[in-house]
A protein has these predicted regions:
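Acidic/polar-rich alpha-helix caps and helix-coil junctions
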Residues: 1-59, 94, 98-321
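Catalytic and ligand-binding motifs that coordinate phosphates/metal ions
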Residues: 90-91
C-alpha cells in the first residue's frame, strides 16, 4: 500500500477476506475488553490487569493517558479529538458524509459512530449513567471540550483499574478486519474496480448502521440525530470514489492512530494538515504558530547516534533535518 503496488495489495487481501476473520456485528462491542481477540481482530498487543505483574504494567499504559477526567476517571486528557474531526461525522439528508467543516450543532444529522468514538458534551458516556461534560476536559479553554471514548473502558468494567496506574485490559489493535476491507477498497479504486470498492465500503457502513446507537440516559430515544446510509448510486468517477474511501477510513478508524500515516501514504499530508491548521488556529490558540513543512514533516528525524553508530554513509538523514 505504501509503495502503490495496488495489484499486490489487492491480491494480499484476498486470503484475509476468504478467512475466518470478519466484522463484529456491533461497532461498539468491538472495543470492549471482554471481546478481545474477537473475529475482527487480526493483530493486537495483548493487555491484562490483576495478573501478578508489578504495578499492573501489563495493562494499557498508553491508554491511561487518554483518561477524560470527570467523576470516574483520572484527568490525563491526551489524544483530544479536534473540532475538525467532530465535524467530519456530519451527514447529509441522504445519510452520507457531508464533508463540511462547519461546526456541528445539536440538531445536525450525524454518523452514529461519532458518539462511540468521541466524548461530546451532554451525550451519555459509556454505561456510567452520566452525561459527558465539557468541564471534564483538561484545560478546556485551550484544547476544547471533546474527549476520547472509543478506547476508554467503562469505569464499571472489571477490566478497568480504578487505582493507579489507571490502566485497562483492552488490547491495542494493530490490524483489524475492518481496516483490511478499507485497504481492499482503496486498491480496488486504483485498479478501476469502482463498483467492488463501493460494495466494500457499504459493508463498513452497513455494520455501523445496524449497530446499537447511543441512547439518552432513560433509554427512550437516540442521544443525537443519527443517520447513516449506504452508497446506492454506482461509482463511475475514480476521484470521487477515492475520496469516499478515504473519508470512510477517517470515520471508521478515528482515534485508532492511523490518520497521519494514511495522509502521508496518500501524498496529501501537506494540503490536508495545512488546510486543517488554517481553520483550527482560529479555534485553538495553542496552534497559532503551528505549521506543516512539506518534504520534512512527513517523517521524523533519524537519531544522529544511530547514523553515527553504523557504517559511514549507509544511512543518511531524512530531508529537512
Amino acid at each position: 500500500m505504501f509503495q502503490g503496488e495496488w495489484q499486490l495489495a489487492y491480491d494480499a487481501t484476498t486470503a484475509v477476506m476468504n478467512s475466518n476473520y470478519g466484522l463484529m456485528d456491533d461497532f461498539q462491542e468491538l472495543f470492549l475488553p471482554e471481546n478481545d481477540n474477537n473475529k475482527e481482530v487480526i493483530f493486537a498487543v495483548q493487555q491484562s490487569i490483576n495478573d501478578g505483574q508489578p504495578s499492573n504494567y501489563n495493562g494499557s499504559i498508553g491508554d491511561r493517558l487518554l483518561a477524560p477526567g470527570g467523576p470516574f476517571y483520572a484527568q490525563y486528557g491526551f489524544h483530544r479529538p479536534s473540532q475538525n474531526l467532530v465535524n467530519a461525522f456530519k451527514v447529509t439528508a441522504e445519510g452520507l458524509p457531508a464533508n463540511s467543516n462547519e461546526n456541528l450543532i445539536d440538531t445536525d444529522p450525524v454518523d452514529p459512530r461519532i458518539d462511540i468514538t468521541i466524548g461530546r458534551p451532554d451525550i451519555p458516556y459509556k454505561d456510567l449513567d452520566i452525561l459527558y461534560q465539557a468541564d471534564w476536559a483538561r484545560d478546556l479553554a485551550t484544547y476544547g471540550a471533546f474527549g476520547p471514548k472509543k478506547r476508554i473502558v467503562s469505569a464499571n468494567s472489571p477490566y478497568h483499574l480504578e487505582v493507579w496506574p489507571y490502566v485497562s485490559a483492552l488490547n491495542y489493535y494493530i490490524i483489524r478486519f475492518g481496516e483490511v476491507i478499507l485497504w481492499r477498497a482503496e486498491a480496488a479504486v486504483e485498479l478501476g474496480k469502482l463498483e467492488e470498492a463501493r460494495q466494500l465500503i457499504n459493508q463498513i457502513r452497513e455494520r455501523a448502521k445496524n449497530s446499537a446507537y447511543v441512547k439518552t440516559l432513560d433509554g427512550s430515544n437516540d442521544a443525537a440525530n443519527y443517520e447513516i446510509e449506504l452508497y446506492k448510486t454506482p461509482w463511475t468517477d475514480k476521484s470521487v470514489a477515492r475520496d469516499a474511501v478515504r473519508t470512510e477510513s477517517r470515520l471508521e478508524l478515528a482515534l485508532e492512530g492511523h490518520r497521519f500515516f494514511n495522509l502521508v501514504r496518500w501524498g496529501i499530508a501537506d494540503k490536508v494538515i495545512s488546510d486543517y491548521l488554517e481553520v483550527e488556529k482560529t479555534r485553538r490558540t495553542h496552534l497559532s504558530n503551528a505549521s506543516f513543512t512539506s518534504d520534512k514533516n512527513e517523517y521524523m528525524p533519524i537519531p544522529q547516534a544511530y547514523i553515527d553508530g553504523i557504517e559511514k554513509g549507509l544511512v543518511t538523514q531524512n530531508k529537512g533535518y
